Amino acid sequence: MACKSAGTRIRSDYMDYKSIRRTLHMGESTERPQDRAEREYRARIEGWSTFRSGVTLRGHEVFVVNFRELAALLDTIREQDTVVTSLWNSLPREVKHAYLNDLIGTEMLSTNGIEGVRSTRKEISDALQAARTNDSGKRFSEFAKLFLTLGDDDDKVPDIPGTLEDIRRIYDQVTAGELKDDDMPDGDLFRKGPVFIDDTATGRRIHTGIEPESEIKVALTQWLALAKDKSIPPLIRAAMCHFAFEYIHPFYDGNGRT
C-alpha cells in the first residue's frame, strides 16, 4: 500500500463547460443525484462533439466533449505551433541544443519536484551530458535520454509504447536507482496492492488507484489502443492519455515521470 500527496490542481472553471458534478448542484430536481449524474453522463458521452477514449475506469468510459472554447483554444495552439516551428527552424543548431538543454533541465527539475525526488541543476546538467554521450552511469541519465529523444530535431518520431512490457521498460528507465524498496512494483509488471492520493492541505483522500493488477492490465491495454487512435486529435488524445494513466496509477511511485 502506498499513499501519495496531491499538489495544486489546475482550475478549469473559467470556461462555460460545466462538469457533471457541478451540473448536479445547479438544478432543483428531486431525482436521485446518482441517477441524474448517470443520465448527464450518457447525454454527454453520446453527443455529436464527443471524443470517446475506449478506456473504461470503474464502469465509466473516459471522454472529452469538444465544446466551443476548447475548439477555439485548439485552433489557437495550432496557429502558434506554425509560428514557433518557423522560428525554431531558423535557429542555428547550437542555439537549439542550448535552449533544449535549458528547457529539458527545467522540466526534469519540475517533474522530480512533483514526484518528491530531490535533484539539483548540476545533477540534471550532468545527466543531460551523459545522455548525449550514452553514459548510463550518471544519476537521471536514462530519464534525460527520454527527454532528449522527444526534443531531437530530426524527423524520427519516438515510438509510442505498444505493449504492457514497454510501459514497464520506460518506468524502469525513468526511475532507475530512485525508488525506495517498498515503492518497487510487486506484481507481474505493476503494483498488486492499493495506492492512495491525499490532499496535503486537508489530509482528505481524493483518489484511489485502480486495483488489482489484473484490472490495471485491462485498463492499460485500453490505454495503449487510445494512444494510437488517430481518429482523435493529438492534443485531446494526449490529455485523455495523461488523465487515464494518472487515474490508473499503475505504480506505487514514479507514475508522473513515466
Regions found by a protein language model. Give the residues of each.
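FIC/Doc superfamily catalytic core
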Residues: 1-258
